[in-house]
Amino acid sequence: MKRRLSTLTLGALPIVVLGTLVTIDHVPGTDIDLTVPYAAEGPGPTFNTLGQIDGQDVVEIGGADVDKTRGNLNMTTVSIRSGMTLAQALSRWLFTDDTLIPLERIYPKNKTPDQVNQENQIAFSSSEASATIAAMNHLGRPVETEVASIVEESAAHGILQEGDVIMDIDGTAVGGPKQVRETVRKKKVDDSVTITYRRDGQKHEATVKLGKNPNDPTIPFLGVSMAAKPAGGITVDYHLKDIGGPSAGLMFSLAVVDKLSGGDLNGGKFVAGTGTIDDDGTVGPIGGIAHKVQAAKDAGAELFLAPAKNCSEAVSRDHDGMTVLSVDSLDDAIKQMDAYNTGGEYTTCKK
């Protein structure tokens, strides 16, 4: 910060004069854009996955007895500001802890902002599905893979229907959407897969000849989107809106486990964290973790769960008063929290 301020002082007059000009984002009377090709990335809001938002549980579970929970399991976010003038970008760099990053890292040239936002929403929905599967697997509860939608004129069109439950593929029981996707990915275009599915309580079997992926004709394509759901009538719904990306997976999964496990995973403490999660419970790295750690610290968290592969970046800034744990799976996160709460051995992130 001192280096930034001294730089500003040496050229104070030119920057002040320039600043008055570049607060305008277009040249008056023209379509000439004066915004800079950078975005400011900083700490975003945090949400308690054990709490409520707009009168609804952030993680709502039906069809099962739900245990009372204590404390916090907060998911964390980063804020992104784009469309800035030079003066606004300089202000973020000088007077905040934001990081300036090339706009192309947020919005690649070959994609529109709407496309990027849609991809982020899809990633967020996928993280919810994986969070549910990982939690059910940890708890030893069965899950089902349901057909959510079907692409018209695709291989599955006219064979599978929305609401069908895929039971096995090529003779192997299906434990989640990822298993179906991986089986199809190992095939070639025009290969066939045999799918056993349940519709209206009746078991059916069909052989489906795989088509071509619309985005890459060399990749086999079944043409269905799938959703994971717990078996036995249990439902899990997530009620956070206007948030994208897959990084809430770990915290969502922990919330589901906490509500169905009969114990306080967090020991009643304020725990925050981040990380993607796969169906098998593997926790993966995410972007902007230094800002997420800052957001958690500002919110009052005592403990932060960081993906092991993000550890050095997670503790690259001041986090005094908050312990940052290194976790690589859902099971590991639960064990580490228990060790922290009971005085056992746990693994912290190192620079």
Predicted features and spans:
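Conserved PDZ fold ligand-binding element
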Residues: 156-179, 293-296, 300-306
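PDZ/PDZ-like peptide-tail recognition elements
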Residues: 34-65, 76-81, 96-151, 209, ...
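Hydrophobic membrane-insertion alpha-helices, especially the h-region
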Residues: 6-25
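Glycine- and Gly-Pro-enriched alpha-helical subdomains that act as flexible
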Residues: 259, 271, 279-304
